[in-house]
Structures are given as structure tokens and as C-alpha cells.
Amino acid sequence: MKSTSVFILFAGIAIMACLQMTGTEAAPSASPNPTPVARADPDPEAFGPVIGLLSGILKSLL
């Protein structure tokens, strides 16, 4: 049971890291004057439920 909880904990951390990387800029287009692409940063409040779930799992391990 504890190995499953540890796996879920690290999977959640990996998912959060992937969500933070989704705000990268797109590759420049082939046109001579490419328009700049705005970076879409994820909202930090969206991670609240995920952080609560991960902290609950971590507390159950201790």
C-alpha cells in the first residue's frame, strides 16, 4: 500500500511539472516577420486541489 501511495505522489508531482511546461512559446513560423506569441502561464490557484491531494497522501504515509 505504501509503495502505491509513493507512486501516486511522484506521479502527481510529474503531472504538475508537465502542466507548468505547457506555457512554452510556439516555434517561430517560416514567415519573415513572425508575430510574437504570448506565453500562457497556468493559473497557480488551479493547482490547489492537486496540492491538497498530494499533501493528504503524504500525511497518510507518515
UniProtKB/Swiss-Prot annotation:
<protein>
    <recommendedName>
        <fullName>Venom peptide 6</fullName>
    </recommendedName>
</protein>
<keyword id="KW-0964">Secreted</keyword>
<feature type="signal peptide">
    <location>
        <begin position="1"/>
        <end position="26"/>
    </location>
</feature>
<dbReference type="GO" id="GO:0045087">
    <property type="term" value="P:innate immune response"/>
</dbReference>
<dbReference type="GO" id="GO:0031640">
    <property type="term" value="P:killing of cells of another organism"/>
</dbReference>
<feature type="repeat" description="AXPX 1">
    <location>
        <begin position="26"/>
        <end position="29"/>
    </location>
</feature>
<keyword id="KW-0044">Antibiotic</keyword>
<keyword id="KW-0295">Fungicide</keyword>
<keyword id="KW-0800">Toxin</keyword>
<keyword id="KW-0677">Repeat</keyword>
<keyword id="KW-1053">Target membrane</keyword>
<comment type="similarity">
    <text>Belongs to the MCD family.</text>
</comment>
<dbReference type="GO" id="GO:0050832">
    <property type="term" value="P:defense response to fungus"/>
</dbReference>
<keyword id="KW-0472">Membrane</keyword>
<dbReference type="GO" id="GO:0042742">
    <property type="term" value="P:defense response to bacterium"/>
</dbReference>
<dbReference type="GO" id="GO:0005576">
    <property type="term" value="C:extracellular region"/>
</dbReference>
<keyword id="KW-0391">Immunity</keyword>
<keyword id="KW-0929">Antimicrobial</keyword>
<dbReference type="GO" id="GO:0090729">
    <property type="term" value="F:toxin activity"/>
</dbReference>
<keyword id="KW-1052">Target cell membrane</keyword>
<feature type="repeat" description="AXPX 2">
    <location>
        <begin position="30"/>
        <end position="33"/>
    </location>
</feature>
<comment type="function">
    <text>Antimicrobial peptide with strong activity against the fungus B.cinerea (MIC=5 uM) and the Gram-positive bacterium S.aureus (MIC=50 uM), and no activity against C.albicans (MIC&gt;200 uM), and the Gram-negative bacterium E.coli (MIC&gt;200 uM). Shows cytolytic activity against insect cell lines. Has no hemolytic activity against human erythrocytes. In vivo, peptide injection in the vicinity of the head and thorax of lepidopteran larvae induces feeding disorder that lasts one or two days before recovering.</text>
</comment>
<feature type="propeptide">
    <location>
        <begin position="27"/>
        <end position="46"/>
    </location>
</feature>
<dbReference type="GO" id="GO:0044218">
    <property type="term" value="C:other organism cell membrane"/>
</dbReference>
<keyword id="KW-0399">Innate immunity</keyword>
<keyword id="KW-0204">Cytolysis</keyword>
<feature type="repeat" description="AXPX 3">
    <location>
        <begin position="40"/>
        <end position="43"/>
    </location>
</feature>
<keyword id="KW-0732">Signal</keyword>
<dbReference type="GO" id="GO:0016020">
    <property type="term" value="C:membrane"/>
</dbReference>
